[in-house]
Amino acid sequence: IKYSLSENTSVRLSVYDVLGREVAVLVNEFKTSGSYEVSFSGDNLSTGVYYYRLDAGTFVETKKMLMIK
């Protein structure tokens, strides 16, 4: 999962199942501006649809992903 920050800010990158339950927290810390890439294997998750949510300061974005095993 790639993301870029235009300024220094607190970042939280979380993964949710289709029922809205948080299944993983990939990032939860203060980051400096720049580009980042986070690996997510999902080894402990079942095949299906998941959502990841990026909270960075006042910016929030949610995207769908498909886990296929």
Describe each PLM feature range:
Residues 1-69:
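C-terminal outer-membrane/trafficking sorting elements
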